[in-house]
């Protein structure tokens, strides 16, 4: 396997794309074989350094509207289909959001994203969030991101005009597995949102969740489908099973499995920010190994309904791995 890993690494470094079959062979690697596993991580790191350098990108998210979601995504604490006890509230007011944004900026965060529950936004609520973004643009130097569910082209244009630079919208899983994760909207709906955001001139941040009982083949399919979308950022969430959701009893992925997956993703999509997102605590401290194995960015602070890592601890750890912030 060692020679095969190096062969594929050299192919990527010649700026050639690896095939699905090649990635399938790569992900079959046994993580108990320390030599092969170390070479995989080292190779992913070389690819990251060649294409992306040593700049790490840190973002933070704010749960600007929580709970009561009409969609039935089986992993999600905010779906109205499941009694998870999640805090429920409408869109937060501008001053509360601005104070949080300024706090994050003072801690050295580069990007700030508002995330809202629900299938999408419209009418007065959407106008309110446009006004909030205009205020954030005027009163901070943060790069502004949005994660507001399904939007159309006109909404994407308005978000861009209000100061948003990046739209985040995960595919969650691959096309042929999506119906097992959500039935109230389609994979096609999500792809349309991503394409409309790009058409409006926004960068896109598109990732998914691993650990939802998908196969390794399905994980790879997701990565290849995301590669076709030409994204700037690829956030990797690790399922954190939430009580009273259909996935509450799913096993949490082992750290070595997560590290192997993110390393192979770097071979597939070499020129993006591969970003640790929700569920990172599943790595049990091995996240710093990932920063030497293809990962080069992170959501810092807490997530939507789960606890994350401290921002100062994250910055220290990332700098210690040789990155610049």
Curated annotation (Swiss-Prot):
Its cofactor is [4Fe-4S] cluster; [2Fe-2S] cluster. [4Fe-4S] cluster binds at residues 69, 73, 76. Homodimer. It comes from Clostridioides difficile (strain 630) (Peptoclostridium difficile). Residues 51-280 form the Radical SAM core domain. It comes from the Bacteria. Belongs to the radical SAM superfamily. Biotin synthase family. Signal peptide: none annotated. Its EC number is 2.8.1.6. Binds 1 [4Fe-4S] cluster. The cluster is coordinated with 3 cysteines and an exchangeable S-adenosyl-L-methionine. Binds 1 [2Fe-2S] cluster. The cluster is coordinated with 3 cysteines and 1 arginine. Keywords: 2Fe-2S, 4Fe-4S, Biotin biosynthesis, Iron, Iron-sulfur, Metal-binding, S-adenosyl-L-methionine, Transferase. One of its GO terms (biological process) is biotin biosynthetic process. This is Biotin synthase. Pathway: Cofactor biosynthesis; biotin biosynthesis; biotin from 7,8-diaminononanoate: step 2/2. One of its GO terms (molecular function) is 2 iron, 2 sulfur cluster binding. It catalyses: (4R,5S)-dethiobiotin + (sulfur carrier)-SH + 2 reduced [2Fe-2S]-[ferredoxin] + 2 S-adenosyl-L-methionine = (sulfur carrier)-H + biotin + 2 5'-deoxyadenosine + 2 L-methionine + 2 oxidized [2Fe-2S]-[ferredoxin]. Catalyzes the conversion of dethiobiotin (DTB) to biotin by the insertion of a sulfur atom into dethiobiotin via a radical-based mechanism. The keyword Amino-acid biosynthesis does not apply. It is an enzyme of class 2 (transferase). [2Fe-2S] cluster binds at residues 113, 145, 205, 275.
């Amino acid at each position: 396997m060692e020679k095969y890993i190096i062969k594929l690494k050299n192919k990527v470094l010649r700026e050639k794309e690896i095939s699905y079959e090649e990635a399938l062979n790569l992900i079959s690697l046994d993580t108990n074989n320390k030599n092969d596993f170390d070479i995989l991580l080292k190779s992913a790191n070389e690819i990251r350094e060649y294409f992306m350098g040593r700049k790490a990108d840190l973002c933070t998210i704010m749960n600007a509207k929580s709970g009561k979601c009409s969609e039935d995504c089986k992993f999600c604490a905010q779906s109205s289909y499941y009694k998870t006890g999640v805090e429920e509230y409408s869109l937060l007011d501008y001053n509360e959001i601005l104070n949080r944004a300024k706090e994050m900026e003072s801690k050295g965060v580069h990007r700030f994203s508002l995330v809202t529950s629900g299938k999408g936004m419209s009418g007065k609520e959407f106008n309110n969030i446009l006004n909030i973004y205009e205020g954030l643009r005027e009163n901070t130097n943060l790069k502004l991101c949005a994660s507001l569910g399904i939007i159309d082209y006109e909404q994407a244009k308005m978000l861009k005009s209000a100061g948003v630079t990046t739209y985040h919208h995960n595919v969650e899983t691959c096309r042929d597995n999506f119906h097992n994760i959500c039935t109230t909207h389609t994979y096609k709906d999500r792809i349309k949102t991503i394409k409309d955001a790009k058409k409006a001139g926004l960068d896109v941040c598109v990732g998914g969740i691993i650990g939802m009982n998908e196969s390794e083949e399905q994980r790879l399919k997701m990565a290849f489908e995301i590669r076709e979308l030409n994204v700037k950022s690829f956030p990797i969430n690790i399922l954190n099973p939430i009580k009273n959701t259909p996935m509450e009893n799913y096993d949490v992925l082992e750290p070595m499995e997560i590290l192997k997956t993110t390393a192979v993703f770097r071979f597939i999509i070499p020129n993006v920010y591969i970003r640790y997102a929700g569920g990172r605590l599943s790595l049990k401290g091995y996240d710093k190994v990932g920063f030497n194995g293809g990962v080069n960015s992170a959501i810092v602070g807490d997530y939507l309904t789960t606890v994350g890592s401290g921002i100062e601890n994250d910055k220290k750890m990332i700098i210690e791995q040789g990155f610049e912030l």
